[in-house]
């Protein structure tokens, strides 16, 4: 297995949410580092958040666990339990099927970098309670209203 070269010019910029839910994420850049190797059991993303940007809309996963490790800068974790500031070396994990939705905001004036590590269950459904929609399984990537 050869090493993959990190190419700063090949970032995925922003989020694919329907407007206006994509707006807070415009300053997000993501590099799916494990995709180049064809890994199917877990994924690792390098994420850069510009000042004022969100990582995602607040969400939780039905069948995927998730871990975030902060490399540089400062991000604010926002959950149903409140807010917590995270900095370099801090780590937080989210269990699958726990409806305590989460996301990160960069409220500082500096770039923040973190790694997002999680499962890759193709049938996972992500629920976005604040935005009022859920994302179908990864292979379909469509958004639909949350069922009552």
Regions found by a protein language model. Name each.
Residues 27-30, 45-61, 99:
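Conserved short histidine dyad/triad with adjacent acidic residue
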Residues 46-50, 60-78, 117-119:
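Short, conserved beta-strand element in jelly-roll/cupin
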Residues 1-41, 125-148:
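A short, N-terminal "cap"/entry segment at the start of jelly-roll beta-barrel domains
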Residues 38, 96-123:
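Ligand-binding loop in jelly-roll beta-barrel domains
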Residues 80-96:
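Short acidic-glycine-tyrosine-enriched beta hairpin
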Residues 51, 88, 119, 130:
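Active-site donor-binding loop signature of nucleotide-sugar glycosyltransferases
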Residues 50-54, 74, 83, 98-100, ...:
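Short, charged/polar surface micro-motifs in flexible loops or helix N-caps
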């Amino acid at each position: 297995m050869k090493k993959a070269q990190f190419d700063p010019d090949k970032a995925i910029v922003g989020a694919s949410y329907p407007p206006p839910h994509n707006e807070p994420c415009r300053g997000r850049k993501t590099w799916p580092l494990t995709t180049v190797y064809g890994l199917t059991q877990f994924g690792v993303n390098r994420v850069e958040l510009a000042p004022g940007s969100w990582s995602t809309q607040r969400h939780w996963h039905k069948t995927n666990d998730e871990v975030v490790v902060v490399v540089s800068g400062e991000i604010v974790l926002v959950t149903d339990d409140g807010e917590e500031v995270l900095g370099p070396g801090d780590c937080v994990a989210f269990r699958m099927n726990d409806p305590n939705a989460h996301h990160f905001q960069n409220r500082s004036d500096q770039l923040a970098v973190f790694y997002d590590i999680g499962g890759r269950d193709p049938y996972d459904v992500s629920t976005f309670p604040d935005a009022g929609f859920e994302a179908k399984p990864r292979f379909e990537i469509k958004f639909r209203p949350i069922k009552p």
